[in-house]
């Protein structure tokens, strides 16, 4: 198995380094990751400036000023040859649950892999301590994929409780929950009296029902949520069509 490994916390983050070490015990791994923390970068691509890379002695590649999506794009299309069999993103420091997936660079890296035609996993730890647990879970899932490929055409978003491995209760297939909207913008002043702003913390849980990713992780289970790239709200298409007709929206602009 040839694995392209990326993240959004940066190439030196403990999550990606722990996971790379574990994956290399049974797979060929190429790390291509941002040279710094790019959390919250979502699916952004660098289009107006060229991208430079730095190669470490162990073969890891950092993309300077690159986003997670940049890294996977370059990894698949230029930097890993032969091409990878699968894209893995993580281990993220902190969860990517519910609405987090909209903003997550970790999920975006996996989404880019899927967009480029490859199976893809995004892995996050619900905390900042037991990266070895998340690495063991990821390796177990990847070995299962080797034995029996999963042909869903979807991204697997995996969230792991921040617990010792022997305290993990199992794995649940879940749906994304949701949070209340985040509404805080924290204002400060720089030494010259200019106002600057920090984006506030995420909103509190809104939908954390028993079948959600929030509930699974809170109860000590690994959450596995299948995500897809198609954002079309298929169930709403007829409603929108009927509204356009009843509202008499015409081509007479």
UniProtKB/Swiss-Prot annotation:
Location in the cell: Cytoplasm
Cofactor dependence: a divalent metal cation
Residues bound to a divalent metal cation: 8-9, 39, 92
GO cellular component, one term: cytoplasm
Keywords on record: Cytoplasm, Hydrolase, Metal-binding, Nucleotide-binding
Cofactor, free-text remark: Binds 1 divalent metal cation per subunit.
Known EC number: 3.1.3.5, 3.1.3.6, 3.6.1.11
Catalytic activity annotation: a ribonucleoside 5'-phosphate + H2O = a ribonucleoside + phosphate; a ribonucleoside 3'-phosphate + H2O = a ribonucleoside + phosphate; [phosphate](n) + H2O = [phosphate](n-1) + phosphate + H(+)
Enzyme class: hydrolase
GO molecular function: 3'-nucleotidase activity; 5'-nucleotidase activity; exopolyphosphatase activity; metal ion binding; nucleotide binding
Pfam (any one): SurE
Free-text function comment from the UniProt entry: Nucleotidase with a broad substrate specificity as it can dephosphorylate various ribo- and deoxyribonucleoside 5'-monophosphates and ribonucleoside 3'-monophosphates with highest affinity to 3'-AMP. Also hydrolyzes polyphosphate (exopolyphosphatase activity) with the preference for short-chain-length substrates (P20-25). Might be involved in the regulation of dNTP and NTP pools, and in the turnover of 3'-mononucleotides produced by numerous intracellular RNases (T1, T2, and F) during the degradation of various RNAs.
Family statement: Belongs to the SurE nucleotidase family.
Protein name, UniProt field: 5'/3'-nucleotidase SurE
